[in-house]
């Protein structure tokens, strides 16, 4: 007699993979973004943007912001890992699609909302007494350069590809 194998309706998440590969993917994204900045392709600086939420000193802000960015990358990697587990597979192209959705939300929702919560970012509602020193990103982060949306798309799709290649649901 043939016995049917029990099927699992829930895939287990790759916790060790998430912990390691989330850091790998975020470090790759940050390195690529920094390289694009140094090449003059964009003026966006995620570590500075995030770090100035905590401190006004730009040097300290970049250090603090780097670690905040790593933490945010881990949070997003958790979402990617959960998605791969739900789909029972992880591939480079699913990772790329998730990266495209990720950057789409970041450029059209998250970054445009930043002036409303960032204490050191200029906004149209801040008034004349504002001491804000950071330029708001604007829609698609175009205030940081015309190539910024393309740079952001490339590095976030790369982030998804890295996770899609390295993570495997169990």
Question: What is each residue range found by the language model?
Answer:
Residues 2, 7-170:
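Juxtamembrane/disordered regions of integral membrane proteins
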